């Protein structure tokens, strides 16, 4: 986890970090997202970080952006609602992975997902473990929606 801590620190994270997320909460309200206290606390802690890492297979610089306002510009609520129905969970957009065109979500039940079209990947319930998996080239559990 040393590497993950280093990447987070490089992105501007520090212990006790709390940022103003009033604009994010307003976007959530306007788009119809629902969120709980844990999801809100996550955003206060990590919002607006840009985590750079080198993709182990493609050997390219990747960018995980924890900016849901920008990420929301790339996905419609119809798609989010389909994901919610499929998972029987409520997803909250928290960012994206730019070069992979993946939208990043935190579910009400505490799981991290990435989505693209009719594919979702479940990365588990630990944010730092998800980053570790991304950096090492591991994949989350693939789930294909039956649309």
Residue spans of the language-model regions?
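Compact, glycine/acidic-enriched structural inserts
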Residues: 120-145
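Short acidic-glycine loop/turn motifs at beta-strand connectors
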Residues: 106-109
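Short, compact, well-ordered microdomains
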Residues: 112-119
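A surface-exposed partner-binding patch
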Residues: 1-102, 143-146
